[in-house]
Regions:
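Conserved alpha-helical scaffold segments that buttress catalytic/binding sites
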Residues: 1-195
């Protein structure tokens, strides 16, 4: 029903609270399947968690990784313990093992990914500056980009959200957007404070 009500052409979509980040999945479903894209997500959480009752804000990345038009998913800025050993069993492993999904994190112990054969799907850094520099150095300019930003990736010095927050500053998002200039085919922003 929602699909039929959406315009055929739209710019960046603002989805409100981070509780609704899974609406990105609906927007991705609207993209043509014959054109491969890279999905770049800025989020303090992996949003790749197991959830037995369908899709929600913490599980949508798994479903997005399965879309035929999605060549690769990069989740940048993860600082949440959701990807630590304590929560390893909660993560969907298949997109990580298949190297369809890469976690780009700061200051989280993710050695367990090596133990399951997914070490190459994890990029660990000690700062947001290092993370963004490394990501931009490997960014594939030939693939169109769908960009999804959850404001919880930003430091509390920049913005307040309802979720635990990351270390990114405005300069990190600006550098990413500048690097993707001309390649972005869709975008959404979530993470407003819930009322």
């Amino acid at each position: 029903a929602l699909h039929a009500q959406m315009p055929s052409d739209y710019g960046c979509v603002f989805t409100g609270s981070g509780d609704y980040h899974h609406l990105s999945q609906l927007l991705l479903n609207r993209l043509p399947t014959q054109q491969k894209i890279q999905l770049i997500i800025c989020d303090n959480h992996p949003d790749n968690m197991r959830y037995p009752f369908g899709i929600h804000c913490g599980s949508w990345v798994y479903w997005a990784s399965r879309l035929p038009q999605v060549e690769h998913v990069h989740v940048l800025g993860i600082g949440s313990p959701d990807i630590s050993l304590k929560h390893a069993w909660e993560n969907h492993w298949s997109p990580l093992v298949k190297r369809k999904l890469t976690y780009w994190n700061t200051n989280v112990d993710t050695r367990w990914l090596n133990w399951i054969g997914a070490g190459r799907s994890n990029r660990a850094f000690t700062s947001a500056d290092e993370l963004m520099s490394a990501f931009l150095a490997q960014l594939d300019p030939s693939l169109p980009v769908y960009l999804s930003i959850d404001k919880d990736v930003l430091s509390p010095q920049v913005v307040n959200t309802n979720w635990d927050q990351g270390e990114f500053l405005e300069k990190h998002l600006n550098a990413l957007i500048d690097a993707c200039h001309g390649s972005i085919i869709g975008a959404d922003i979530t993470g407003d404070v819930s009322a």
